[in-house]
């Protein structure tokens, strides 16, 4: 049994179940007792609390917090305590674009165009706010039942207008989707 399921986080978020596990965090479905709504609570994995990579988790909350777009998941709250760090987001009742493609096989061109248009509008909004996602892939795109797309997981996003450039000896991104420049660890 997970240590958060069945517990209340910060006296407000009643954690109901795990809905996803990523490299940096575990995502839970929860009930916000104050605003009386279902939310997603993304909790940083305990082993990463003191890790330098934790900076990515903070980047995600900062990146999403400045955006307000119907095709980008909304952030409602963040918490950065010593023992638990989390982001509270809009709960997306849907499936990933990857799951959808696996079920459907080849997408009809009209669906592909409709989804791509929404994704591009979301990315344009992010770019207008000075944010580069850097990990766009079908697993980071959610599809609602009504066909609405939501771009998620800004964990390795960076602010494009910042003075600091990302140049390290590490590749940033998902191996099947990163550009050759990212794979070489060059500036992005």
Identify the function of each model-found stretch.
Residues 120-131:
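Protein kinase catalytic-loop region centered on the HRD/HxD motif
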Residues 45-66:
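AlphaC helix of the eukaryotic protein kinase fold
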């Amino acid at each position: 049994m997970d240590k958060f399921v069945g517990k209340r986080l910060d006296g407000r978020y009643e954690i109901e179940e795990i809905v996803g596990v990523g490299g940096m965090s575990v995502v839970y479905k929860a009930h916000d007792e104050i605003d009386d709504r279902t939310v997603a609570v993304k909790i940083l994995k305990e082993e990463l609390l003191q890790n330098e990579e934790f900076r990515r988790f903070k980047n995600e909350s900062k990146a999403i917090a400045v955006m307000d777009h119907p095709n980008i998941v909304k952030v409602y709250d963040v918490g950065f305590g010593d023992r638990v760090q989390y982001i509270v987001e809009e709960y997306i009742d849907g499936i990933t674009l990857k799951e959808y493609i696996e079920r459907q096989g080849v997408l009809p061109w009209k669906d592909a165009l409709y989804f791509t248009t929404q994704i591009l509008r979301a990315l344009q909004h992010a770019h207008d706010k000075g944010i580069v996602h850097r990990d766009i892939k079908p697993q980071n795109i959610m599809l609602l039942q009504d066909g609405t797309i939501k771009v998620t997981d800004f964990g390795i996003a960076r602010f494009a207008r910042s003075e600091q450039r990302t140049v390290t000896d590490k590749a940033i991104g998902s191996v099947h989707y990163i550009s050759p420049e990212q794979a070489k660890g060059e500036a992005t």
